């Protein structure tokens, strides 16, 4: 609920390409006020030092601190459904640190009981189409095809109003190999011959699982920012990266929160 309220009364342009998310007006002055009001609520448990009116840059960053074992995957799945219901956001990329977590996330999203819960118990009239990006085995000579999961994600249409498209990717695939950076595939997607460019064109929302493994100076995070240029990054985790602020004697190390909306202590 808190994440959805960040976008309250912010201008959202729905007149976009059928394969793209609506365009959020990231210059809106409403973001700062909305975020600060959410942080002030007692139930959000956000410490005073983390309540601040930070400006929004080219990407809106939102942080949710949840201890391990408190239902993080469930919460961000709920967030996906709610953002789709309220604002028509239907393209989400979930970045995870490992192949094991990637498999676990995919299993959760595809579970029959999970689908039934969100549809029958919570009343969301939408279905998540789950794609999992896998490493491609070295191809022999012949035609080079776009990664199947990327194609399905990008080509997913907003005209299917009850469909949400999710692509799960582990961090190594964002930085190693040429699968997402090469531009010599034989077939293009929506006019794009490079997978990263095709993904960027969807104006995705990115969910980062376990943000301490995606620090700002790490290659995978840099790839998310520079190659995907998401409209919004939402980080869910028990531990967040550290960052150094100040100079000289005032230099100190603090948690690298950006717009912390919730702090759930176990």
What would you call each of these model-derived segments?
Residues 1-70, 74-88, 107-111, 115-116:
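ATP-dependent helicase/translocase motor core
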Residues 21-54, 134-152, 183-195, 216, ...:
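Surface-exposed intrinsically disordered loops and tails
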Residues 57, 159-163, 227:
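Extracellular/periplasmic catalytic domains that process cell-envelope and extracellular macromolecules
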Residues 61-69, 76, 92-97, 127-135, ...:
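Extended hydrophobic secondary-structure segments that form protein cores and membrane-embedded regions
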Residues 75, 88-134, 171-173:
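Conserved Walker A/P-loop ATP-binding site and its immediately adjacent core
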Residues 78-85, 99, 103-107, 168-266:
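Signature of the SF2 helicase/ATPase Hel1-core->accessory helical subdomain module
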Residues 89, 162-164, 230:
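Short, high-confidence coil segments that cap the C-terminus of an alpha-helix
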Residues 116-186:
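Inter-Walker segment of RecA-like/P-loop motor cores
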């Amino acid at each position: 609920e808190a994440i959805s309220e960040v976008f309250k009364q912010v201008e959202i342009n729905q007149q976009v390409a059928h394969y793209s998310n609506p365009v959020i007006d990231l210059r809106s002055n409403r973001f700062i006020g909305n975020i600060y009001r959410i942080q002030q609520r007692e139930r959000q448990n956000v410490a005073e030092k983390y309540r601040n009116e930070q400006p929004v840059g080219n990407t809106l960053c939102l942080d949710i601190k949840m201890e391990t074992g408190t239902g993080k995957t469930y919460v961000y799945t709920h967030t996906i459904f709610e953002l789709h219901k309220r604002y028509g956001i239907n393209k989400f990329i979930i970045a995870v640190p490992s192949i094991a977590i990637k498999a676990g996330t995919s299993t959760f999203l595809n579970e029959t009981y999970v689908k039934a819960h969100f549809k029958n118990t919570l009343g969301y009239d939408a279905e998540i189409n789950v794609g999992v990006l896998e490493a491609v085995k070295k191809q022999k000579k012949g035609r080079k095809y776009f990664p199947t999961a990327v194609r399905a994600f990008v080509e997913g249409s907003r005209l299917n109003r009850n469909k949400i498209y999710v692509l799960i990717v582990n961090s190594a695939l964002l930085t190693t190999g040429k699968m997402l950076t090469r531009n010599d595939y034989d077939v293009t997607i929506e006019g794009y011959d490079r997978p990263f460019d095709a993904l960027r064109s969807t104006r995705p929302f990115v969910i980062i699982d376990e943000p301490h493994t995606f620090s700002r100076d790490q290659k995978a995070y840099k790839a998310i920012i520079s190659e995907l240029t998401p409209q919004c990054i939402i980080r869910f985790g028990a531990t967040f990266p550290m960052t150094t602020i100040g100079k000289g004697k005032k230099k100190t190390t603090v948690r690298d929160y950006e717009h912390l909306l919730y702090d759930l202590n176990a």
